[in-house]
Design a protein with these regions (language model features):
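N-terminal strand-loop element at the rim of the active site
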Residues: 5-6, 12-19, 26-27, 31-79, ...
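A conserved mid-protein helix/loop that constitutes part of the nucleotide-sugar donor-binding site
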Residues: 24, 28, 201-216, 236, ...
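Glycosyltransferase donor-sugar binding loop
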Residues: 46-48, 197, 225-238, 253
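Carbohydrate-associated surface elements
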Residues: 155, 174
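Conserved donor-binding/catalytic core segment of Leloir-type glycosyltransferases
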Residues: 186-205, 211-215, 227
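Nucleotide-activated donor-binding/catalytic signature segment of Leloir-type glycosyltransferases, i.e.
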Residues: 237-261
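Short hydrophobic beta-strand element within catalytic cores of glycosyltransferases
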Residues: 269, 293-296
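Conserved acidic donor-binding segment of nucleotide-sugar-dependent glycosyltransferases
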Residues: 308-309, 313-320, 329-335
Length: 392
């Protein structure tokens, strides 16, 4: 990259302390841009400010609310709005990059509070939601303030079009592909091992589908084992497993980025049995880069990311028998599995930050044309109307 050095404000709507795809995307983008010489400040809800990186400014502590089949930790309201305005005022930014600006969050508050070049990235892929339609009259003029819009996938783009009747350029989430290509094979994790990473207590991550498929898989692949990593309480999950199969499971809990790279380089198959609510599937891109053969449910986001089956195998979503059938085929046919993994590893390079960040920066350049930077908006009627303070 040979770029003009910018002052960039990134807004992350979700709690910085909680693992998640959006948080990882914002963190990696911020650190990539900083390494390229740009000034970057991230505004996010933060619980433990002492552990946050120097480039992160806390907008306050998030609260947990149900959203899109999971629990999102967000921040909203007049106190947060004041902090957003202060951050914008202090930042003297050339450009703001707001993530998920269409949900009640500090990203939406920043869009209300600012004038000037603003890029919005839309991550969510969700069914039509009454809550978004209810505040549509407020959202639409705010979203129109965005100079440019990015969607991380066709699924996210479709959600944006359906909810707010606007469009976006598709630029995928980024990964550091080299980190996963350089993973080391851990002998005890290798062999006929199926890997799963995710919040396994969260139903939409689909671990119960894999658990239901395992007895079938074990009949045809007697040496199969399952390696599970991620946050959650494993006791209840273990109790739901057939006692005769429990010895085949190992629960690792949270793992580091290095351990994740080794995990993905070691397992024979990485399985993503998610049942919905996904817009991209960053873990699939990481698994491809790590050299695992990927087997995923055929939800739209995964089907698209895997090239409709060219770079990873697919099974019918929420169908344990189909999952078992495809997994058995891959476990018993090593040549087929290795060929699939090889295609996936080569394909994963398109998600590397060197590619993705270049595409994002090109959007920044477009948004900056004719601009003199970001300023505070003096027009807050939408905010006052939302709070029932019209005329105040």
């Amino acid at each position: 990259m040979n770029q003009k050095k910018l002052r960039i404000g990134l807004v992350c709507p979700y709690g910085w302390d909680t693992p998640g795809g959006v948080q990882s995307h914002v963190r990696d983008l911020a650190e990539y841009l900083i390494a390229k010489g740009h000034y970057v400040s991230v505004l996010a809800p933060v619980v433990d400010e002492e552990k946050a990186p120097e480039y992160v400014t806390s907008a306050g502590k998030p609260i947990a609310i149900p959203y899109n089949g999971a629990v999102a930790r967000l921040l909203f309201g007049p106190i947060a709005f004041a902090r957003v305005r202060q951050w914008i005022s202090n930042g003297k930014f050339d450009l703001l990059h707001l993530h998920e600006p269409a949900i009640p969050s500090i990203s939406l508050l920043a869009c209300w509070a600012a004038e000037g070049p603003m890029v919005g990235t839309f991550h969510a892929a969700a069914k039509r939601q009454k809550a978004i339609f209810a505040i549509g009259p407020i959202l639409e003029p705010v979203i129109e303030k965005l100079t440019a819009r990015i969607a991380v996938s066709e699924a996210a783009r479709s959600t944006l079009t359906e909810h707010l009747e606007t469009d976006a350029v598709v630029i995928p989430n980024g990964i550091y592909a080299d980190r996963y290509r350089d993973g080391e094979v851990v002998e005890k994790w290798s062999g006929n091992t199926i890997g799963f990473i995710g919040r396994y207590e969260e139903p939409r991550k689909g671990l119960p589908v894999l658990l239901e498929a395992l007895p079938i898989i074990a009949r045809f692949a007697p040496d199969v084992s399952v390696l599970v990593a991620g946050p959650g309480e494993s006791k209840e999950v273990i109790e739901s497993i057939d006692p005769q199969l429990r010895s085949r499971f190992e629960f690792l809990g949270r793992i580091s980025e290095k351990e994740k790279a080794d995990f993905l380089s070691s397992v024979a198959i990485y399985v993503a049995p998610n049942t919905g609510g996904e817009s991209f599937g960053i873990i699939l891109a990481e698994a491809l880069a790590g050299g695992a053969a990927v087997l995923a449910s055929d939800i739209p986001a995964f089907d698209s990311l895997l090239g409709h089956g060219e770079f990873g195998a697919l099974f019918k979503s929420e169908d344990p028998q189909d999952l078992a059938h495809v997994a058995i085929d891959l476990l018993r046919d090593g040549d087929k599995r290795r060929a699939l993994a090889k295609r996936g590893k080569e394909y994963a390079q398109r998600f590397d930050w060197d590619v993705v960040a270049e595409d994002i920066y090109s959007i920044y350049e477009m948004a900056l044309v004719g601009s003199s930077g970001v300023t505070l908006s003096s027009e807050n009627r939408a905010w006052n109307r939302f709070l029932g303070r019209e005329g105040s």
